[in-house]
Amino acid sequence: MKVLLVGGGGREHALGWKIAQSPVLSTLYLAPGSPGLNPLGVPLGISADDIDAIVNTSVEKSIDLVVVGPEATLAAGLADRLATAGIALSLIHI
């Protein structure tokens, strides 16, 4: 399973750490990544605010699941755009 984790804060680090332990994970992509997250996956250098780049990259890389940390990214319409593209989304609020 290919997962894209959006965000680079402490919440996303905790999520990324756990996702990276999954036996079904093939690749963990990070948007944008951070010094703490980067060892867990593949940093893409995409801003968490760049909805177009997140959606386009998800389609290009055949991402199975997008996990979003920042609420601002969701408020900007990422959930709707991913749904239109047929990509699963996990909304995590801790």
PLM feature spans:
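Glycine-rich adenosine-cofactor-binding loop
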Residues: 5-12
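N-terminal glycine-rich "phosphate-gripper" loop used for MgATP/nucleotide binding
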Residues: 44-83
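N-terminal beta-loop-helix "entrance" segment that forms/cooperates
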Residues: 30-49
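Extreme N-terminal starter segment of soluble prokaryotic enzymes
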Residues: 1-3
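Glycine-rich beta-strand-to-loop/alpha-helix junction loops that act as flexible
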Residues: 8, 32-33, 69-71
